[in-house]
Amino acid sequence: MPKKAIISGVYNTKVGEVPGSTAMSLHAEAARGAIADAGLKLADVDGVLCAYVITETYPMLSSAFCEYVGIQPNFNAGVNAGGATGAIMVMQAAAMVEAGICKHV
């Protein structure tokens, strides 16, 4: 039976200027919030996709993010597709789940 991908958790951070926050800390907050909303633990996540940011430089953002939050995924990648980045990331996550590469992205 083919696997069907779903969005099981969501979370929104504050937007705009958020004193005391970095792009990485906001990425981490969003990830932890979405993981909790899905009823999962960090250890359940086996795939990671990160959107690049223009305010801070991380040559390997997705790998740096995984280290920052303590995730050891089977797959991780940074995505930069301009205004389509969010949609592309959802499509990539669904493809990885449906192909059986990952369970939780």
Whereabouts are the PLM-identified features?
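Conserved "HGTGT" condensation-loop signature of ketosynthase/thiolase-family condensing enzymes
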Residues: 1-78, 95-99
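Active-site-proximal alpha-helical scaffold in enzymes
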Residues: 81-105
